[in-house]
């Protein structure tokens, strides 16, 4: 159970970082 929770946490963190980078690149491209 703990491994599943940590796996989902890691997946969520990776998704958040990817989304943040994507938004950052889009903002830089707009400027």
Swiss-Prot record:
Main localization category: plastid
GO biological process: photosynthesis
Keyword field: Chloroplast, Electron transport, Membrane, Photosynthesis, Plastid, Thylakoid, Transmembrane, Transmembrane helix, Transport
Membrane-topology annotation of the record: Single-pass membrane protein
Assembly notes: The 4 large subunits of the cytochrome b6-f complex are cytochrome b6, subunit IV (17 kDa polypeptide, PetD), cytochrome f and the Rieske protein, while the 4 small subunits are PetG, PetL, PetM and PetN. The complex functions as a dimer.
UniProt family annotation: Belongs to the PetL family.
Protein name: Cytochrome b6-f complex subunit 6
Origin species: Triticum aestivum (Wheat)
């Amino acid at each position: 159970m703990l491994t599943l929770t940590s796996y989902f946490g890691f997946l969520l963190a990776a998704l958040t970082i990817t989304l943040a980078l994507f938004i950052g690149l889009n903002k830089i491209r707009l400027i």
